[in-house]
Design a protein with these regions (language model features):
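N-terminal small-domain helix-loop-helix segment of the aminotransferase-like
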Residues: 8-97, 104
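N-terminal low-complexity segments that are often proline-rich with Ser/Thr-Pro
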Residues: 212-214
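Conserved core of the PLP fold type I
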Residues: 58-189, 206
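A short helix->loop->beta-strand "cap" motif at the edges of active sites that frequently abuts
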Residues: 193-196
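Alpha-helical scaffold elements within enzyme catalytic domains, especially in hydrolases
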Residues: 23, 189-190
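Generic N-terminal amphipathic, Lys/Arg-enriched alpha-helix
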Residues: 1-8
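Conserved small/polar residues in nucleotide/adenosyl-binding loops
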Residues: 203-210
Length: 214
């Protein structure tokens, strides 16, 4: 019987990290280092706000872009910590996690045949997101001698006339590599020259706010 699913879905390999996660979840006294999540319960003040919202009946649809107050606070936080100003009405979209943001972002930017540059090792969802968006993932193999940081030379060598997006995790997942300001400035010049989108997977903002930011 022919598989009824789309070929691009069938061809996506399951996440190895998730396989280990499922195995460890059935074991007692095992510490999982598989998925990136805190090793403590959600703080009570956050849980209290969630409970309060439920009790106040805030359980209905919001704007497609997310709660107004949340989008405004996101802009305020980015402006305060990084000195960059965004318009909360037109430039901020709240998603259910970073993977959804990358998924819908690539779908919005890519046409069939466009290329998405993905430095690896990297988070397992980047490549499937590019494929599901109809794009072609192009892998840039990062080197240990460069501390797994993307270099300007590696980026330039990977760019073609079909290149549309560069995915740039900060810090790198799973290696933990952090791009220095000089690295980013060199890459920014190449990005500007070739007019390429950059999708920054900026997951751990609070943990690295003392360094030079993107």
């Amino acid at each position: 019987m022919r598989n009824p699913l789309a070929d691009k879905v069938v061809d996506i390999k399951p996440s190895g990290i998730r396989k280990f996660f499922d195995i460890v979840s059935e074991m007692q006294d095992a510490i999982s280092l598989g998925v990136g999540e805190p090793d403590f319960d959600t703080p009570w003040h956050i849980r209290d706000e969630g409970i309060y919202s439920l009790e106040k009946g805030r359980t209905f649809y919001t704007s497609n872009a997310g709660l107004k107050d949340l989008r405004q606070e996101i802009c305020n936080t980015i402006r305060r910590k990084q000195g960059v100003t965004y318009d909360w009405q037109h430039e901020v979209l709240v998603t259910v996690g970073g993977s959804e943001a990358i998924d819908i972002g690539l779908r919005a930017m890519c046409n069939p045949g466009d290329e998405v540059l993905i430095p690896q090792p990297s988070y397992v969802s980047y490549e499937p997101c590019a494929i599901l968006a109809g794009a072609t993932p192009v892998i840039i193999d990062l080197k240990a001698e460069n501390e797994f940081r993307l270099t300007a030379e590696e980026l330039e060598a990977a760019i073609t006339d079909k290149t549309k997006v560069l995915i740039l995790p900060f810090p790198n997942n799973p290696t933990g590599a952090i791009m220095e300001k000089s690295d980013l400035e060199a890459i920014a010049k190449i990005i500007e020259k070739h007019d390429i989108f950059v999708t920054v997977s900026y997951t751990h903002l609070r943990a690295h706010e003392t360094r030079e930011d993107l």
